[in-house]
Amino acid sequence: MESLTLQPIARVDGTINLPGSKSVSNRALLLAALAHGKTVLTNLLDSDDVRHMLNALAALGVSYTLSADRTRCEIIGNGGSLHAEGALELFLGNAGTAMRPLAAALCLGSNDIVLTGEPRMKERPIGHLVDALRLGRAKITYLEQENYPPLRLQGGFTGGNVDVDGSVSSQFLTALLMTAPLAPEDTVIRIKGDLVSKPYIDITLNLMKTFGVEIENQHYQQFVVKGGQSYQSPGTYLVEGDASSASYFLAAAAIKGGTVKVTGIGRNSMQGDIRFADVLEKMGATICWGDDYISCTRGELNAIDMDMNHIPDAAMTIATAALFAKGTTTLRNIYNWRVKETDRLFAMATELRKVGAEVEEGHDYIRITPPEKLNFAEIATYNDHRMAMCFSLVALSDTPVTILDPKCTAKTFPDYFEQLARISQAA
């Protein structure tokens, strides 16, 4: 297996222009495909997940052109739901941001489409979304294991009263929200359980509004969506920088700055993960907010005990930053780490122990006490981009770290390690 050894880093300083947000990129691509008119998306993320969405849209007959660097995309909207000529199978890798929204959108009208993906995708639950779509009369068949992809979709979704469990993934609600306006009838979506990752729902609602669709949000408990609507192209749309990707550079600055400035997001960003900067500030770093940047300057870091449900992806970065904080850090309410690219709670606990931390892994929490000195370790990344990026922070100590399968960052940030090296000074 390929590996990358990072030598100790004495200091980080500089500016990072963030790649586009994965969450925003894939939502914007799908809405542009469903919309009337031509949409130009700029600062689109070029990554595996986005390529899976683009390949799926092409297979569904959506016409688009990409710039050479794949960050500018012109899409000719379909002016309504997407249909395949005859039976079709779409392979979506391990891209939850493609699988979930497409599973819903392709239930409109009549289709015969199979959605499948990598082995890990077949372990990521989708039953709550399927149950909800079936309440709206969608015809969906599980082809292997009940409640998991691959799925056969045969259209039929008309709207109506739909319940969805919000406790595992907000992507199920996102998928329903994006599909419901194109259904023939009104849809009332009722949330069962506690809604996780609420800020990701705000991204969805924000984008739907940009594409001309309003819905009624009743305190995140119930959403009322008028049927028979259509999406309208906003013309040009700039994809925000990826706030989860920003977390690694901001944390690096908190630990070994200097000052690092990330551009492409700012105080008015729609992504909940910008709140990560508040957590660093609470730990002792200095944060400065601009309209299109966030900067972080080093501080003495102290441990925290916090509910991280609102920033599940960026919270992983706090788990490795905790290695550099004084005291024991506890991250709570993070059960949904277990249903991501890998079981992130198990993976994080396992790898933190390798570098010498004392770790308590709970059902939905993790408690981390750093060692006096970090051990050298080979870090397994579980084909999970965030594991690779999180553990790069270990190099901010006096100890090198080896990252196995470093190219797995291609899911959201193909040149992550080059960018980190650019702002780093060797010890």
From Swiss-Prot:
Organism: Shigella dysenteriae
EC number, UniProt record: 2.5.1.19
Coiled coil: none
Catalysed reaction, written as an equation: 3-phosphoshikimate + phosphoenolpyruvate = 5-O-(1-carboxyvinyl)-3-phosphoshikimate + phosphate
UniProt protein name: 3-phosphoshikimate 1-carboxyvinyltransferase
One MF annotation (Gene Ontology) recorded for this entry: 3-phosphoshikimate 1-carboxyvinyltransferase activity
GO biological process, one term: chorismate biosynthetic process
Broad EC category: transferase
Subcellular location per the Swiss-Prot or TrEMBL entry: Cytoplasm
Annotated residues for binding of phosphoenolpyruvate: 22, 96, 124, 171, 344, 386, 411
Catalytic site: 313
The protein's annotated pathway: Metabolic intermediate biosynthesis; chorismate biosynthesis; chorismate from D-erythrose 4-phosphate and phosphoenolpyruvate: step 6/7
